[in-house]
A protein has these predicted regions:
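Conserved beta-strand elements of the Class I
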Residues: 59-61
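Glycine/small-residue-rich loop that forms an oxyanion/phosphate-binding "nest" at active or ligand-binding sites
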Residues: 47
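Short alpha-helical "recognition helix" segments of helix-turn-helix
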Residues: 9-16
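Solvent-exposed, charged/polar functional surfaces in cytosolic regulatory/catalytic domains
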Residues: 44
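Conserved mixed alpha/beta core segments that line enzyme active sites in large multi-domain catalysts
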Residues: 81-85
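Single, function-defining residue in the core of a domain
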Residues: 1-4, 12, 21, 25-33, ...
Length: 389
């Protein structure tokens, strides 16, 4: 669907006839969908697609979240935010946590939470534990500073996978036990023993006092319990200069014989592709123009847009762009590719076919690498149901 009202969307697909389904019939069909049905469809679709691997070995999965403004409902306390200077009437939000395959340009899983109940830590652990990956597959989970926690590290390690997560100076200093003041480059392996007890007498390895880190009872750590009072974890702490005078801390468990500083810089920049994917599902795929008020239906729309995104991305990636002597390298215009793929999916009955790849290849745009822009934080109210054709 696009940004029109439901009735117009139905006319667009079925034709402007008296036989077109009604709005009530459409919503009755939505009610028949079982919880988890669209997730199963996403996973089944992804299994049929080939994977692009980093260094021919690792699948790169970026994990991040994005807020989505939904229909205003002050009675839903789990999604409603009180009025403020930017929103005098208040607003409601859902929160989309997603795993995104960077090299394949497709979403692999979602955890959708109500705005006020959002918890990126638990969502990350859930996606890692339920990841639909092959038995011998190797995955690198990449995430921003908000995901740096011992519990997240442990979940990836216990699932036999790898992670590369940005971290603040304060958190890294807590792990290392020393200041980063004046440190411009760092690549250090550390062993840490996590425990909820602050008593030195209860330690199983008192001779390794500098290895111990206390985990508060208020902080989730799923691998500590009354039976298992200590958890040992091995980390690699890296500090790289991304641009002149700009340093980033990365915490990982990647082997040093395969990944050096240049590899980490490359991976760091690749992670931002997920931000583009969130933009694509909100604007070219019209997720900002929701068609539902009920939260359950909003979730269905999110899953549906993500499945459509993966379908469009797979076709766009495999469309060859003619090579010419130009100032810039060119790539497929994804916004146009979405419109073309959507028109293709509407073909049914006796309608003629269309040259999807040819149309996509004729709509291209220049690739301008290295450009950066400051993020503009501004509130945008969701598109009202009253202002659609």
């Amino acid at each position: 669907m696009e940004g029109e009202c439901i009735k117009e969307e139905l006319y667009t697909f079925f034709g402007r006839t008296t036989d077109a389904p009604s709005k009530s019939a459409f919503y009755k069909q939505l009610q028949k969908l079982k919880d988890g049905a669209l997730r199963c469809l996403l996973l089944a679709f992804n299994r049929r697609l080939s994977k692009n691997l980093f260094n021919g070995k690792y699948q790169l999965l970026a994990c991040d979240g994005s807020a989505l403004d939904i229909f205003r409902n002050p009675d839903d306390k789990d999604t409603f935010y009180e009025p403020n200077a930017k929103s005098p009437k208040g607003y409601n939000q859902a929160y989309i946590n997603a795993c995104y395959s960077i090299l394949d340009r497709r979403f692999t899983d979602l955890v959708i939470q109500k705005g006020r109940k959002r918890n990126e830590y638990s969502a990350f652990c859930q996606m890692v534990d339920t990841a639909d990956i092959g038995h011998l597959a190797m995955v690198i989970y990449m995430a921003d500073r908000g995901f740096a926690s011992y519990n997240n590290f442990a979940h990836v390690i216990e699932n036999g996978q790898y992670f590369l997560i940005r971290s603040s100076d304060k958190r890294v200093e807590g792990i290392l036990g020393r200041s980063l003041q004046g440190v411009k480059s760092l690549d250090l392996h550390v062993e840490r023993i996590l425990t909820r007890s602050q008593s030195k007498k209860k330690r199983e390895h008192p001779e390794l006092a500098e290895y111990y880190r206390h985990i508060s009872s208020r902080v989730p750590m799923d691998y500590l319990s009354d039976e298992k009072r200590e958890y040992r974890i091995s980390l690699r702490v890296v500090r790289v200069e991304i641009s002149p005078g700009c340093f980033e801390n990365l915490i990982t468990n990647l082997p040093d014989h395969e990944f050096d500083m240049d590899d980490f810089k490359e991976l760091y920049h690749l992670r931002w592709n997920e931000e583009n994917a969130f933009r694509d599902i909100k604007y070219p795929l019209c997720l900002k123009a929701l068609h539902s008020k009920k939260y359950e239906y909003v979730e269905q729309e999110i899953w549906a847009r993500v499945i459509l995104h993966n379908f469009c991305a797979e076709i766009a990636i495999n469309t060859e762009v003619e090579k010419r002597q130009r100032k810039y390298e060119y790539q497929v215009n994804y916004s146009q590719a979405v419109k073309i793929c959507r028109d293709f999916l509407r073909i049914h009955g006796q309608k003629s076919t269309m040259d999807v790849e040819g149309l996509i290849a004729s709509n291209i745009e220049a690739v301008r690498p290295g450009r950066t822009f400051q993020r503009q934080k501004r509130f945008k109210i969701p598109m009202s149901f009253c202002y659609r054709n």
